[in-house]
């Protein structure tokens, strides 16, 4: 990240596993032994230390444990991405570990719309069933770092932290109670915290939150094919440059209809989320209003994605096969333009609406 320091060059001094051992042992001696301070060494990087169990053990087994030495590890075997597998370095080795969790993912709206991921990080996603909760209950990790905000470089910029707070509250309370308080109990505590008025509101807020997790899987990622996870990030909706390899795979495996159906399923889910949001009342009118506005925001975002994705995929399919589905493409273009107009009106008419996405990448 040296883009603002044009005359500087960033480079790591760590090139081998043994380099890690030398560095960590120096830090351990200077910080833990000589000064009796806490040392938290973050494993995040692209060389394997963060995601390879053999790499991790090869380094850490050569370092003597210390009560004030911790290793910090993301819960994903990659960046904080929905389709990333559970990190295999968690719960292994001799050293105490801190697990990192992100409440505001830059690839998934940054809190601009519902995105409840804490439950599935704890109990397992449909496509990635490993469960962090079991490690917490067995006290195999020493604690958690929660990125309550942050992630990414730009927008959307939010006017209310509700959805970031939900993920942060559930995860922090679960680790604080060492798993002896269930996710469901903690979720109900959050409903009380935001002043939901009645059982119907609590029930609808629960359904809405759980549905958001599935909706983002189908709207942004896929359960059927590999996709460039970074085709959207921050407030940018990427295009054919980011999705060409994905489209090649979809076409080669005859999954065009499946791919479009996933996006349609996501939009139907968001329609249900909007319906549920209109039947949720909080004693705090700002909260009630934001639930409605942010749910509409999510609907427009993923409806736009569905149409844009369809236009690009069907257009690319036409280039490959020389057989264009012209009427479907025209219909999606008309819907795409209309949805963008309505999305902009949502922002113009609501002061608490997050800043909008842009129809292009960085």
Kindly give the residue locations of the regions a language model identified.
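Substrate-binding groove of N-acetylhexosamine-processing glycoside hydrolases
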Residues: 14-362
């Amino acid at each position: 990240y040296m883009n603002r320091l044009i005359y500087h060059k960033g480079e790591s001094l760590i090139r081998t596993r043994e380099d890690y051992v030398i560095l960590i042992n120096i830090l351990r001696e200077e910080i833990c032994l000589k000064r009796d301070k806490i040392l938290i060494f973050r494993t995040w990087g692209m060389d394997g230390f963060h995601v390879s169990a053999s790499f991790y053990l090869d380094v850490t087994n050569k370092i003597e444990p210390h009560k004030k030495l911790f290793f910090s590890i993301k819960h994903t075997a990659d960046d904080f991405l929905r389709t990333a597998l559970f990190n295999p370095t968690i719960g292994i080795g001799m050293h105490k570990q801190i697990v990192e969790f992100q409440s505001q993912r830059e690839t998934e709206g940054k809190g601009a719309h519902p995105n409840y991921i804490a439950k599935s990080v704890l109990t397992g996603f449909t496509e990635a069933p490993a469960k962090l909760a079991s490690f917490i209950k067995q006290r195999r990790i020493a604690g958690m770092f929660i990125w309550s905000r942050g992630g990414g470089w730009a927008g959307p910029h939010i006017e209310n932290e509700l959805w970031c707070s939900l993920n942060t509250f559930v995860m922090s309370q679960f680790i604080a109670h060492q798993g002896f308080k269930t996710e469901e109990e903690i979720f109900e505590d959050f409903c009380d915290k935001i002043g939901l008025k009645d059982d119907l509101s609590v029930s609808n807020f629960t359904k809405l939150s759980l549905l958001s997790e599935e909706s983002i899987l189908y709207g942004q990622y896929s359960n059927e094919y590999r996709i460039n996870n970074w085709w959207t990030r921050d407030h940018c909706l990427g295009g054919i440059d980011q999705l060409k390899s994905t489209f090649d795979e979809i076409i080669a495996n005859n999954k065009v209809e499946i791919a479009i159906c996933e996006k349609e399923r996501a939009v139907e889910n968001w329609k249900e989320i909007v319906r549920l949001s209109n039947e949720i009342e909080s004693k705090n009118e700002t909260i009630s209003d934001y639930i409605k506005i942010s749910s509409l925001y999510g609907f427009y975002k993923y409806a736009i994605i569905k149409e844009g994705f369809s236009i690009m995929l069907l257009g690319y399919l036409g280039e490959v096969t020389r057989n264009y589905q012209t009427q479907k493409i025209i219909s999606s273009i008309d819907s795409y333009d209309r949805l963008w107009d309505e999305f902009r009106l949502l922002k113009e008419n609501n002061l608490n609406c997050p800043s909008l996405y842009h129809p292009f990448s960085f």
